[in-house]
From Swiss-Prot:
Cell inner membrane as UniProt keyword: no
Any GO BP annotation: 1,6-anhydro-N-acetyl-beta-muramic acid catabolic process
Annotated EC: 2.7.1.170
Binding site for ATP: G12, T13, S14, M15, D16, G17, V18, D19
GO function terms (MF aspect): ATP binding; kinase activity; phosphotransferase activity, alcohol group as acceptor
Protein name: Anhydro-N-acetylmuramic acid kinase
Chemical reaction(s) catalysed: 1,6-anhydro-N-acetyl-beta-muramate + ATP + H2O = N-acetyl-D-muramate 6-phosphate + ADP + H(+)
This protein's UniProt keywords: ATP-binding, Carbohydrate metabolism, Kinase, Nucleotide-binding, Transferase
Length: 369
């Protein structure tokens, strides 16, 4: 059978690098052929972080960063192909998520904005690019997120198996696969790694809390945890999605101001529990029991996984590797899949998940010619 190669490009709210994956969709299940992470240079990272906070001269900075991120994504593709020695002519298309700088679907005129110019990626790689996956769903009245549940349904669903796929990036999202004729559901639960990363970066200048060791050295403060969990987002009904617009460093500092007597490691433990409790609450609303499979960076945080297991005794807990998909690359593979769906003219959103008025083919194609 002829190979069906697609590349997926993903940089999430954590901004911890550009993940690039080469995937073969010629078989029944996606096959990861090669993977590569391109580090985001510090000057570009600072520019992106500034752009995520309202300030002046945003249009000029947006235009420059759009090109810069496109160049970085193209570099990730070219390095990926060099690593696996596959010619660009063998790749049908690149699916590029881009870098989200605003996600505000709940305004009167909702919008989402990802940068990373697909024209630049196509020009510098010589491969057609499919990008801008979220805005069609928003145009149809949806949240534009999460988009991965349709991929999860096709890849992980099994009749008779009640499964939840939990993706923990900067933001955490879940996909509920009921294992019967009931609707697949999915939504953002709230912060994933974004606040625990922000706090350790601020206090210790470390990029992330490796294996949750710093959180494990602290003790959760119940008063602070209760206050954090009182954020209105956690009581919203789905479909719902969120991002740095709600859960960011400014919000965190505001929440911490009455708790400045706490030790720094106790705050880290409490922030980790915010992630775990918000996830567990939403899961228990869907079902008290089932199979839980975790992907994304959070799957590699042992303390996070331990705390989830305690909060969810009715669930078996594994990473998606138990289902044949490497948890580190699952989201990149999903965007390669979204590119394939666009190429084949097939819908890729789930209206029950996003709230869109109908299914739709997502993304636009940017030719390398």
């Amino acid at each position: 059978m002829k190979n069906a190669y697609y590349i997926g490009l993903m940089s999430g709210t954590s901004m911890d690098g550009v993940d690039a994956v080469l995937v073969d969709f010629s078989g029944a299940q996606p096959q990861l052929i090669a993977s590569h992470t391109e580090a985001i240079p510090s000057h570009l990272l600072k520019g992106l972080q500034r752009l995520c906070s309202p300030s002046t001269d945003e249009i000029n900075r947006l235009g420059r960063l759009d090109r810069n991120v496109g160049e970085l994504f193209a570099l990730a593709v070219n390095n990926l192909l060099t690593k696996c020695a596959i010619a660009k002519e063998e790749v049908i298309a690149i699916g590029s998520h881009g870098q989200t700088v605003r996600h505000m679907p709940n305004l009167e005129v909702g919008f989402t904005l990802q940068i990373g110019d697909p024209n630049t990626i196509a020009t510098e790689t010589g491969i057609d690019v499919i990008a801008d996956f979220r805005r069609k769903d928003i145009a149809l009245g949806g949240q534009g997120a999460p988009l991965v549940p349709a991929f999860h349904q096709q890849t992980f669903a099994e009749v008779g198996k009640k499964r939840i796929i939990l993706n923990i990036g900067g933001i955490a999202n879940i996909t509920y696969l009921p294992g019967n004729s009931d609707q697949v559901l999915g939504f953002d639960t709230g912060p994933g790694n974004t606040l625990i990363d922000a706090w350790i970066q601020q206090v210790k200048s470390e990029p992330f809390d490796r294996d949750g060791e710093w959180a494990a050295s602290g003790k959760t403060d119940q008063g602070l945890l209760t206050q954090l969990l009182s954020h209105p987002y956690f009581s919203l009904a789905y479909p719902k999605s969120t991002g740095r617009e709600l859960f960011n460093q400014a919000w965190l500092e505001q929440q911490l101001s009455p708790f400045n007597h706490l030790d720094e490691e106790d705050i880290q433990s409490t922030l980790l529990d915010l992630t775990c409790h918000s996830i567990a609450r939403d899961m228990i609303k869907l079902s008290n029991e089932g199979e839980l499979y975790v992907c994304g960076g959070g799957a590699f945080n042992g303390q996070l996984m331990q705390r989830l297991a305690v909060l969810l005794p009715g669930y078996t807990l594994n990473t998606t590797s138990a289902l044949g998909v490497d948890p580190k690359w699952a989201e990149g593979i999903a965007f390669a899949w979204l590119a394939m769906r666009n190429h084949l003219g097939l819908p890729a959103n789930l209206p029950a998940v996003t709230g869109a008025s109908r299914e739709a083919v997502l993304g636009g194609r940017f030719s390398a010619k």
